[in-house]
Curated annotation (Swiss-Prot):
The keyword RNA-binding applies. This is Small ribosomal subunit protein uS13. It is found in: Cytoplasm. Belongs to the universal ribosomal protein uS13 family. GO terms for cellular component: cytosol; small ribosomal subunit. Gene3D superfamilies: 1.10.8.50, 30s ribosomal protein s13, domain 2 (4.10.910.10). InterPro entries: Rbsml_uS13_C (IPR027437), Ribosomal_uS13 (IPR001892), Ribosomal_uS13-like_H2TH (IPR010979), Ribosomal_uS13_CS (IPR018269). It comes from Argopecten irradians (Bay scallop). HAMAP family: Ribosomal_uS13 (MF_01315). It comes from the Eukaryota.
Length: 152
């Protein structure tokens, strides 16, 4: 960071219900938002014509607004479908970028749907077991331990 802090420097920005550190570079500061990675942040900054070498606190109100609008509706700004984190949604078949609280809600809804239709994945989630085909004979043991009775 520069030795002299600019006059209109914001140390903390509030974007999409998340506090963003103003001292970090904009591309990396945006990754504090849940559902936002470095690659997506980079694309959003380029589409918004924001210099990625700038610190998050140095951005003007106009630049912040542009970044937020592109983050919230990326398909209007020609960000490809394969770049988005919610592809072919089960309910409506749409492509979207889900972030912050909406991401948690979508994940919970997906798990509830899997449990409701009694899918194998849903049942494994319900039982608290490994879901993705891992072995469970020896690893992943937790909870109360069962001791072995000693011979007299």
């Amino acid at each position: 960071m520069a030795l002299i802090i600019p006059e209109k420097f914001q140390h903390i920005l509030r974007v999409m219900n998340t506090n963003i550190d103003g001292k970090r570079k904009i591309m990396f500061a945006m990754t504090a938002i849940k559902g936002m990675g470095r690659r997506y942040a980079n694309v959003v900054c380029k589409k918004a014509d924001v210099d990625i070498t700038k610190r998050a606190g140095e951005l003007s109100e106009d630049e912040i607004e542009r970044v937020i609008t592109i983050m919230s509706n990326p398909r209007q700004y020609k960000i490809p479908n394969w770049f988005l984190n919610r592809q072919k949604d089960v309910k409506d078949g749409k492509y979207s970028q889900v972030m912050s609280n909406a991401l948690d809600n979508k994940l919970r809804e997906d798990l509830e749907r899997l449990k409701k239709i009694r899918a194998h994945r849903g049942l494994r989630h319900y039982w608290g077991l490994r879901v993705r085909g891992q072995h469970t004979k020896t690893t992943g043991r937790r909870g109360r331990t069962v001791g072995v009775a000693k011979k007299k």
